[in-house]
Protein backbone atom coordinates (compact mmCIF):
# COMPACT_ATOMS: atom_id res chain seq x y z
CA UNK A 1 0.00 0.00 0.00
CA UNK A 2 1.47 3.33 -1.02
CA UNK A 3 1.73 6.46 1.07
CA UNK A 4 -1.03 8.17 -0.92
CA UNK A 5 -3.47 5.34 -0.20
CA UNK A 6 -2.60 5.44 3.48
CA UNK A 7 -3.18 9.21 3.60
CA UNK A 8 -6.56 8.87 1.91
CA UNK A 9 -7.60 6.07 4.27
CA UNK A 10 -6.44 8.13 7.24
CA UNK A 11 -8.49 11.10 5.98
CA UNK A 12 -11.54 8.84 5.69
CA UNK A 13 -11.05 7.43 9.18
CA UNK A 14 -10.54 10.91 10.67
CA UNK A 15 -13.75 12.09 9.03
CA UNK A 16 -15.56 9.05 10.39
CA UNK A 17 -14.22 9.71 13.89
CA UNK A 18 -15.26 13.36 13.55
CA UNK A 19 -18.74 12.29 12.49
CA UNK A 20 -19.03 10.03 15.52
CA UNK A 21 -17.68 12.66 17.92
CA UNK A 22 -19.47 15.78 16.65
CA UNK A 23 -22.83 14.33 15.74
CA UNK A 24 -24.85 16.74 17.87
CA UNK A 25 -24.51 19.65 15.41
CA UNK A 26 -25.81 19.27 11.88
CA UNK A 27 -23.14 21.50 10.31
CA UNK A 28 -20.30 19.45 11.82
CA UNK A 29 -21.91 16.23 10.65
CA UNK A 30 -22.29 17.61 7.12
CA UNK A 31 -18.64 18.69 7.01
CA UNK A 32 -17.50 15.25 8.16
CA UNK A 33 -19.71 13.57 5.55
CA UNK A 34 -18.21 15.79 2.85
CA UNK A 35 -14.72 14.81 4.00
CA UNK A 36 -15.67 11.15 3.78
CA UNK A 37 -17.10 11.57 0.29
CA UNK A 38 -14.01 13.46 -0.89
CA UNK A 39 -11.69 10.76 0.41
CA UNK A 40 -13.86 8.05 -1.20
CA UNK A 41 -13.70 9.94 -4.50
CA UNK A 42 -9.92 10.21 -4.28
CA UNK A 43 -9.55 6.55 -3.36
CA UNK A 44 -11.83 5.44 -6.22
CA UNK A 45 -9.97 7.59 -8.73
CA UNK A 46 -6.57 6.33 -7.55
CA UNK A 47 -7.69 2.70 -7.62
CA UNK A 48 -9.09 2.98 -11.13
CA UNK A 49 -5.98 4.76 -12.40
CA UNK A 50 -3.64 2.23 -10.82
CA UNK A 51 -5.54 -0.83 -12.03
CA UNK A 52 -6.08 0.53 -15.60
CA UNK A 53 -9.69 -0.59 -15.42
CA UNK A 54 -11.18 1.62 -18.12
CA UNK A 55 -14.75 0.36 -17.82
CA UNK A 56 -15.13 1.96 -14.38
CA UNK A 57 -13.94 5.45 -15.31
CA UNK A 58 -17.39 6.90 -14.64
CA UNK A 59 -17.58 5.65 -11.04
CA UNK A 60 -15.78 8.66 -9.45
CA UNK A 61 -17.95 11.07 -11.45
CA UNK A 62 -21.12 9.30 -10.27
CA UNK A 63 -19.81 9.44 -6.70
CA UNK A 64 -19.29 13.20 -7.06
CA UNK A 65 -22.86 13.60 -8.33
CA UNK A 66 -24.22 11.78 -5.29
CA UNK A 67 -21.98 13.87 -3.01
CA UNK A 68 -23.30 17.08 -4.56
CA UNK A 69 -26.90 15.91 -4.10
CA UNK A 70 -26.17 14.97 -0.50
CA UNK A 71 -24.62 18.38 0.15
CA UNK A 72 -27.56 20.24 -1.40
CA UNK A 73 -30.15 18.29 0.59
CA UNK A 74 -28.10 18.62 3.78
CA UNK A 75 -27.70 22.38 3.39
CA UNK A 76 -31.40 22.80 2.64
CA UNK A 77 -32.21 20.83 5.79
CA UNK A 78 -29.70 22.93 7.76
CA UNK A 79 -31.30 26.18 6.58
CA UNK A 80 -34.76 24.85 7.37
CA UNK A 81 -33.81 23.76 10.89
CA UNK A 82 -31.87 26.93 11.68
CA UNK A 83 -34.69 29.18 10.44
CA UNK A 84 -37.33 27.23 12.34
CA UNK A 85 -35.57 26.61 15.65
CA UNK A 86 -32.56 28.96 15.66
CA UNK A 87 -30.04 26.14 16.25
CA UNK A 88 -28.42 23.43 14.19
CA UNK A 89 -28.82 20.60 16.67
CA UNK A 90 -29.60 17.21 15.21
CA UNK A 91 -32.11 16.72 18.04
CA UNK A 92 -34.28 19.39 16.38
CA UNK A 93 -34.79 17.09 13.41
CA UNK A 94 -37.15 14.93 15.46
CA UNK A 95 -39.45 17.94 15.79
CA UNK A 96 -39.81 18.41 12.02
CA UNK A 97 -43.06 16.66 11.28
CA UNK A 98 -45.38 17.34 8.38
From Swiss-Prot:
It is found in: Mitochondrion inner membrane. Pfam families: Oxidored_q2. One of its GO terms (biological process) is ATP synthesis coupled electron transport. GO terms for cellular component: mitochondrial inner membrane; respiratory chain complex I. The keyword Cell membrane does not apply. Keywords: Electron transport, Membrane, Mitochondrion, Mitochondrion inner membrane, NAD, Respiratory chain, Translocase, Transmembrane, Transmembrane helix, Transport, Ubiquinone. GO terms for molecular function: NADH dehydrogenase (ubiquinone) activity. InterPro entries: NADH_UbQ_OxRdtase_chain4L/K, NUOK/Mnh_C1-like. Core subunit of respiratory chain NADH dehydrogenase (Complex I) which is composed of 45 different subunits. Belongs to the complex I subunit 4L family. This is NADH-ubiquinone oxidoreductase chain 4L. It comes from Balaenoptera borealis (Sei whale).
Amino acid sequence: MTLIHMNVLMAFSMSLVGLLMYRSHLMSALLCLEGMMLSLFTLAALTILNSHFTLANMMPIILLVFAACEAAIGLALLVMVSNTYGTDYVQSLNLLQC
